[in-house]
Structures are given as C-alpha cells and as structure tokens.
Swiss-Prot record:
Name under which the protein is recorded: Tropinone reductase homolog At2g29150
Disulfide bridges in this chain: none
Organism: Arabidopsis thaliana
Gene3D superfamilies linked to this entry: NAD(P)-binding Rossmann-like Domain (3.40.50.720)
PANTHER family on file: 3-OXOACYL-[ACYL-CARRIER-PROTEIN] REDUCTASE, TROPINONE REDUCTASE
Length: 268
C-alpha cells in the first residue's frame, strides 16, 4: 500500500501548484487557452497583449473563475517593451519564473514573390526575435526558480510546406532555437521545447473557416478529418511544464491530427 507521502509526491508531478508563468499574447486564441490551462492547474500567470481593452475583458473573466492572473500591455515586436515586460514579471514574481510560453506571434501568408522587406522584418521580429530575446532576458529568472520550462509556440509550417515561406522560415528557426537552447541551458535546469499546431480554431485561422473549399482541403489533408481546438494545444503546453515532463527537452512536437506525417493515398 502506498504511503501518504508517496501519494503526495505522485500528485505534485502532475500539478503546477506554486509555479509562476509568463504567457505572451494571452488575450485570445491559443494564448488565452494556455493561460487558462496553466492557471487551472495551479500556476500564477502573468500575460500580455497589445490590445488593452481585450486584455482587461479577459482579466475580468479569469478573476471570475478564481484564476491568479496578472496582465500588462506589450507589443512583443518592440525590444524596449519586451524589456519592460520582463521587469514587470520579475517584480510580480519576486525575481523567479518557472514557465515561459513564447506564444505571441503573427502570420502573413502570400506567394514568396510578393513578400516585402517590411513583411519579412515584421514576421522575424514578432515570431523569432521576440522569442529569443524574451528567453534570453528570462534566463536569470528561470535559473533562479531552480526548475524552468520554456515552450515555443511554433507551427507545422516550420516543418512542412504550407504555402507561407517566410512565416514557415520564422517558425523553423524557432524550432532550431529551441533545440539549441535546450542543450545550452540544460545545466541550468531549464528545459526548452517547441509545440507545432496545425490548423486550430482561433481568430488567426478564421480566414480558413470562412472559405468552405479551403476548410475542406485542410480536413482532407488531416488524417483525423477535422481541425483542432485550442485546448488540444494548451494541454500539451501544460504537460511540458509539469514536473512529470522533467526529462523532456529539445523536442519539437506537432499537434496536428496527423497532417505533418500524411503522404498521399488514393481511395477509390
């Protein structure tokens, strides 16, 4: 028969109780789902977004649910605002951070010949540069916590062709950054992993759902025959932050209903 102490240790492996987390871009879509997932599992969460009105609406909802969430306005494409964000996080959490979810990002989808220099710079600054810089300036806080976990919200577009070359390049670079940091920071007890969603029901993918032919093409490409839901992504993010995932680092994991491994098959 298991002892009470052993049961307690087993439960703590599957809990975020007492942990602190920063989730960027948490006012909608995947970020909102991640904030709720982590808070529901016991973490104290700070999140940011560009839209203050939307952020305050979410905050009222989270407070009504009893979640411990604080917020601040931040455009992660701005280096100055990223530094201010981390100062705020350090103050809120007394210089220690267990979890960093680099979720904020943007997408510009167009033929490669039509991408402008401004498109390229904006995509790289928002998706890649911000993820690296936030990880870099969060490093002292993650190390101070004694056990840190970074999760990059990447995309299947970083692994296979999806018709968005520069967007895909920003996510592919993010995946490699995750592998590099995982190796470099393992000695500081900081784990780093990337999560790659396929088409998920969020505001970012609304253009797909408004086009019946495009939606059907996505579903046909996906072995499971449907698009994903935000909570199917946030559950993986939470798992990677659990103590139970303490030996998982440097991984790039798809949440895609099998889309990224699907080849071609003809069914007459």
């Amino acid at each position: 028969m298991a002892k009470a102490g052993e049961n307690s240790r087993d439960k703590s492996r599957w809990s975020l109780e007492g942990m602190t987390a920063l989730v960027t871009g948490g006012s909608k879509g995947l970020g909102e789902a991640v904030v709720e997932e982590l808070a529901m599992l016991g973490a104290r969460v700070h999140t940011c977004a560009r839209d203050e009105t939307q952020l305050q609406e979410r905050l009222r909802e989270w407070q009504a649910k009893g979640f411990e969430v604080t917020t601040s306005v931040c455009d992660v494409s701005s280096r100055e605002q990223r530094e201010k964000l981390m100062e705020t996080v350090s103050s809120v959490f007394q210089g220690k951070l267990n979890i960093l979810v680099n979720n904020a990002g943007t997408g510009i989808i167009k033929p490669s010949t039509e991408y402008t220099a401004e498109d390229y710079s904006f995509l790289m600054a928002t998706n890649l540069e911000s993820a690296f810089h936030l990880s870099q300036i969060a490093h002292p806080l993650l190390k101070a916590s004694g056990s840190g976990s970074i999760v990059f919200m990447s995309s299947v577009a970083g692994l296979v062709h999806t018709g968005a070359s520069i967007y895909g390049a920003s996510k592919g670079a993010m995946n490699q950054l995750g592998r590099s940091l995982a190796c470099e920071w393992a000695s500081d007890n900081i784990r780093v992993n990337s999560v790659c969603p396929w088409v998920i029901t969020t505001p970012l993918t609304s253009f797909i759902f408004s086009d019946e032919k495009l939606r059907k093409a996505v579903e046909d490409k996906t072995p499971m025959g449907r698009v994903g839901e935000a909570n199917e992504v946030s559950s993986l993010v939470a798992f990677l932050c659990f103590p139970a995932a303490s030996y998982i680092t440097g991984q790039t994991i798809c949440v895609d209903g099998g889309a990224s491994v699907n080849g071609f098959s003809f069914k007459p």
